[in-house]
Amino acid sequence: MFKVDWDLGPVSKSASDQTKESRKEKKRKKGERKNVGDKGEKLNEKVLKKAKSVTTNNSLKSEIKKEKSVPSIKEKNKGDAKHTKLTSLQQKMKDKLDGANFRWINEQLYTTESDKAVQMFKENPDLFDIYHAGFRYQVEGWPENPVDIFIQHLKIRFEHSNAKKKNNIVIADLGCGEAKIASTFRKSRSLQVHSFDLVAPNEHVVACDIANVPMADETVDIAVFCLSLMGTNWQSFLKEAYRILKVGGLLWVAEIKSRFSDKSGEVFAKELPKLGFETKSIQLQNKMFTLFEFKKVPVHGKCEELPPILSACIYKRR
């Protein structure tokens, strides 16, 4: 009989069992790889978000820093103002210089003939602005401006009463300055204003010598001299007004009282009939100036020369 030893060691697995185990192992490893991949993606997302946040914050900080480094318009203007603002001493010196320039121009206008004044402003146009800036400053201290009184008279006496008439009232503002009368009535249907001065500061004004106005004979209803009988040949201004006025037309004059030889203007009213102007009214109540209204009447023969009844208006030096 054969003796059989049953201790054969580990029993080998069949081929089918080995195949099943191999598949399970592959699935397990695949699952592990997937889990690792998911964790890696999540980790990458977190890292990217954090990196993006850091980048954004850094860029914002950079932009804020840039904005702070660039001054605003307000700060820039404030900085410029520091450089352009005059000190009180500089301002006083500037005011003194402006006042001296105004007085010098004013003296030239009153002590020379009008043709020389025209030439002066042609050569130096800025002088006209300097003069009128100084003149505005002087007028601010007056109780009222005579041009405003003339404007009120035009509104009350002529603008409304002439509204329905076909023909306009023609006004010549002689020595108009900045043409306040023309600008006031620029839309009026009943008043037509022609403005003349040595320089044309705006569209309303025609530059000319007041002794030679570019208007036809007897075409004007009202001629106005508002503080503008300047120059040593002021009588030629009045003769020119007589030429352009219609017979029966009105001459309005406003002048500083200190210019008249009698310090009131009554002697002026008595003398003007020699030039063909009949006195209609004279207003003496204002402390600064006198207002006149004359009417043009026919003159037979040559007009007489007036005596020296109107002196130059020279401002005192401070």
UniProtKB/Swiss-Prot annotation:
Which Pfam families is this protein grouped with?
Answer: Methyltransf_8 (PF05148)
Write down the species. Answer: Schizosaccharomyces pombe (strain 972 / ATCC 24843) (Fission yeast)
Q: Could you say which enzyme class this protein belongs to? A: transferase
Locate the region Disordered.
1-85
**Which UniProt key words apply to this protein?**
Methyltransferase, Nucleus, rRNA processing, S-adenosyl-L-methionine, Transferase
Protein name in the entry = 25S rRNA (adenine(645)-N(1))-methyltransferase
Ranges of Basic and acidic residues compositional bias?
A: 33-48, 62-83
Q: Which reaction equation describes what this protein catalyses?
A: adenosine(645) in 25S rRNA + S-adenosyl-L-methionine = N(1)-methyladenosine(645) in 25S rRNA + S-adenosyl-L-homocysteine + H(+)
> What's a single GO CC term here?
nucleus
Which one GO biological process term can you cite for this protein? ribosomal large subunit biogenesis
User: Cross-referenced InterPro entries, in alphabetical order?
Assistant: RRP8, RRP8_N, SAM-dependent_MTases_sf
Which protein family is it in?
Belongs to the methyltransferase superfamily. RRP8 family.
For this UniProt entry, the molecular function terms from Gene Ontology, in alphabetical order, are: rRNA (adenine) methyltransferase activity; rRNA (adenine-N1-)-methyltransferase activity
**Function recorded in the entry:** S-adenosyl-L-methionine-dependent methyltransferase that specifically methylates the N(1) position of adenine in helix 25.1 in 25S rRNA. Required both for ribosomal 40S and 60S subunits biogenesis. Required for efficient pre-rRNA cleavage at site A2.
Looking up SUPFAM superfamilies in the UniProt record yields: S-adenosyl-L-methionine-dependent methyltransferases
Gene from which the chain derives: rrp8
Location in or out of the cell? Nucleus, Nucleolus
**Assigned EC number:** 2.1.1.287
Just give the chief location class.
nucleus
Q: Which residues bind S-adenosyl-L-methionine?
A: H132, G175, D197, D209, C226
